Amino acid sequence: MRIAVICFCLLGMAYALPVKHADSGSSEEKQLYHKHPDALATWLNPDPSQKQNLLTPQNAMSSEEKDDLKQETLPSKSIESHDHMDDIDEDEDDDHVDNRDSNESDDADHPDDSHHSDESHQSDESDEVTVYPTEDAATTVFTEVVPTVETYDGRGDSVAYRLKRSKSKMFHVSNAQYPGASEEDLSSHVDSEDLDDTPRAIPVAQHLNVPSDWDSQEKDSHDVSQVDDHSVETQSHEQARQYKREANDNSVEHSHSIDSQESSKVSQESQSREFRSHEDKLAIEPKSEEDEEHRQLRVSHELDSTSSEIN
């Protein structure tokens, strides 16, 4: 409905806009100049009587402008009528909701006339759906009554308070559940209900004190999960330690291999040095023997020469 009203308002505003006529003053002036040259010549004279004779076509145009002004005023009335219709529709919607609430309250107060009221409401709802398809049906939410367990801790004499509480409750409900019953009957009924309720508290306490199988299973699973987590942690620590040990062993072996290689190199160098020194010694010894032989020959030759001189 609001969209339709907005569309109508826009259309009314479009129709209300003034239409500009083609400016044909130049052609009219030319026609007047050809037809009435004397009148145009006298237009410059300040005689008001002659000017009124020439202003007759402008007066004719003023009537058209009046019609345009009348057309401009009409859409405002239509807009006001649309606003008035919107107000009427809103009032009808409010009345419809109030009537529906009153009908629901009447149904709750008078359940015996359900058939007649249902038929009338069904017919009304069918008519309302056809008239107002956009409205949502009013639904009532019913909450279920959940029984609660009352505790009597910190109330002095719990047994007496419980008896008073139960009796007051039963006296409040007596008119609705047991019409025409006396107070003695109600008190006996309360006592019987108290006696019936007393053994029911023992199994509840037993169930609360005794752990269920499900709780035990949950505890076992929790313990097993903790043990598994602990075992996983220990395994991870052991693996880390083994990795460290292997790394240390590898480093030690590598260092030993490097040391052995260095020692072998040193031993080879020492052996090569000894071999070279032995070869040098062997080369020096034959030279010394040759020198001694030369010396002996010289000595013997000198002795022979001296002996020959002496002779």
Swiss-Prot record:
Q: Which InterPro entries match?
A: Osteopontin, Osteopontin_CS
Q: How is the protein modified post-translationally, according to the record?
A: Extensively phosphorylated by FAM20C in the extracellular medium at multiple sites within the S-x-E/pS motif. The phosphorylated form inhibits hydroxyapatite crystallization. Dephosphorylation via a mechanism involving ALPL/TNAP promotes hydroxyapatite crystallization. O-glycosylated.
Query: Where's the motif Cell attachment site?
Result: 155-157
Which terms does the UniProt entry file under GO BP? Answer: biomineral tissue development; cell adhesion; osteoblast differentiation; positive regulation of bone resorption
Acidic residues bias (residue ranges): 86-96
Domain of life of the organism encoding this protein: Eukaryota
> PROSITE patterns, per this entry?
OSTEOPONTIN (PS00884)
State whether keyword Secreted applies.
yes
- The name on file for this protein is Osteopontin
Specify the species: Oryctolagus cuniculus
Q: What lineage does UniProt assign to this protein's organism?
A: Eukaryota, Metazoa, Chordata, Craniata, Vertebrata
Whichever gene encodes this chain, its name is SPP1
